[in-house]
Regions:
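Polyanionic, low-complexity intrinsically disordered segments
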Residues: 3, 8-16, 74-77, 116-125
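Amphipathic alpha-helical interaction surfaces
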Residues: 39-47, 67-71, 85-88, 92, ...
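Charge-enriched, short contiguous segments at helix-coil
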Residues: 77-125
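Hydrophobic alpha-helical packing segments in soluble, helical-rich domains
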Residues: 25-55
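Amphipathic alpha-helical interaction segments
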Residues: 31, 35, 39, 60, ...
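Membrane-proximal, non-transmembrane interface segments of integral membrane proteins
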Residues: 1-33
Length: 125
C-alpha cells in the first residue's frame, strides 16, 4: 500500500479501538474516526487520480471523488453523515455513546468498501 504512495490508516483499519473508546469518550472516538475517514478519502483520491489541494476539506474531497465517479451517491451520503457528526464532536457538540456507535456502524460499511477497492488495485486512468 505504501509502495503506491498511500497513507497508512492510524489503526490499520481496525475500528474496534474506536468502539471501546466510544464507551468512555464518544467525542474523542469520533475525532479519531474523522482522521481514519480522511485518510481513506485521500488514498481513494490518489488511486483514482483525483487532484487535491493541500487544504481541501473532507467534504470537498468527497465531492471531487463523486464527480470523478470514484464513489457512488450512497457512499457520498454515508461519508457526509460520518463527517458531519465527527466534525460536530470535534467542535464541542456532546455526542452520546450510542450515537458514536451508530456512526461507527456506517463507517465500518465504508471501510469494508474501501478494503474491497484496495484488493482490486488502482483504476488505470
Amino acid at each position: 500500500m505504501l509502495n503506491f504512495g498511500l497513507q497508512p490508516s492510524p489503526t490499520g483499519l481496525e475500528f474496534s479501538h474506536y468502539r471501546i473508546l466510544a464507551e468512555q469518550d464518544p467525542n474523542l472516538a469520533l475525532a479519531g474516526l474523522r482522521m481514519e475517514v480522511e485518510t481513506m478519502l485521500k488514498n481513494l483520491s490518489k488511486g483514482f487520480n483525483v487532484s487535491l489541494e493541500e487544504r481541501d476539506s473532507a467534504g470537498i474531497i468527497t465531492r471531487k471523488l463523486k464527480e470523478k465517479g470514484a464513489i457512488t451517491s450512497q457512499q457520498t451520503e454515508l461519508v457526509s453523515a460520518v463527517i458531519q457528526l465527527c466534525n460536530a464532536a470535534i467542535h464541542g457538540t456532546k455526542v452520546l455513546s450510542y450515537q458514536a456507535q451508530e456512526i461507527l456502524d456506517i463507517a465500518e460499511i465504508l471501510r469494508d468498501e474501501y478494503v474491497s477497492w484496495l484488493s482490486w488495485g488502482f483504476q488505470d486512468n
